[in-house]
């Protein structure tokens, strides 16, 4: 069993039950999925950079990313129909817990000038978004192999109904929030 999943079952669930007075086991919030997405910007013209960004996200997540292509042309942005403009990966189950464990314990401490996660990342429905400015904080990425420094967005989707429930869940799992 994943370390983070066992922490959730043994420590976080009892705390949430006492804090929010849940009567049913299925009311306790849990993490449904983690979505890692990144846009290409101007680097979508170079196939070499595009391939390196795909390999980086595959190494970070352990899963092949899905390319997002433009639905129509926008001449102001030099985007043609069918051109790749981004990619995303959706993680569930053990891969999700493994990624979150590496994110909390390895990646966040490697960030420069990191004072904790911002509480404003909650969306009002119990989900949390965090934006990363560079991919070099992940131990799977070698700094010498980075062709273009691009960030990514990580969305943590929970079953929590409110931001307070989601905050308690993520704080119990070890997310370093700045309060």
Curated annotation (Swiss-Prot):
InterPro entries: Ribosomal_uL5, Ribosomal_uL5_bac-type, Ribosomal_uL5_C, Ribosomal_uL5_CS, Ribosomal_uL5_dom_sf, Ribosomal_uL5_N. GO terms for molecular function: rRNA binding; structural constituent of ribosome. GO terms for biological process: translation. It is found in: Plastid. Coiled coil: none annotated. Keywords: Plastid, Ribonucleoprotein, Ribosomal protein, RNA-binding, rRNA-binding. GO terms for cellular component: plastid; ribonucleoprotein complex; ribosome. Belongs to the universal ribosomal protein uL5 family. Part of the 50S ribosomal subunit; contacts the 5S rRNA. This is Large ribosomal subunit protein uL5c. It comes from Euglena longa (Euglenophycean alga). The gene is rpl5.
């Amino acid at each position: 069993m994943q370390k983070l999943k066992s922490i959730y079952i043994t420590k976080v669930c009892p705390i949430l039950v006492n804090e929010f007075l849940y009567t049913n086991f299925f009311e306790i919030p849990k993490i449904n999925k983690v979505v890692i997405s990144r846009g290409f910007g101007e680097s979508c013209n170079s196939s070499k950079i595009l391939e390196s960004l795909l390999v980086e996200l595959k190494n970070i997540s352990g899963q092949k990313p899905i390319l997002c292509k433009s639905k129509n042309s926008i001449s102001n942005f030099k985007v043609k129909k069918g051109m790749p403009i981004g990619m995303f990966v959706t993680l569930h189950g053990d891969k999700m817990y493994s990624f979150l464990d590496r994110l909390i314990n390895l990646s966040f401490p490697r960030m420069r000038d990191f004072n904790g996660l911002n509480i404003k990342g909650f969306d009002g429905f119990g989900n949390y978004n965090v934006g990363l400015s560079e991919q070099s904080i992940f131990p799977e990425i070698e700094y010498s192999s980075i062709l273009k420094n691009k960030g990514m967005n990580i969305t943590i989707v929970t079953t929590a109904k409110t931001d307070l429930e989601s905050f308690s869940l993520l704080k119990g799992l070890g997310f370093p929030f700045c309060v």
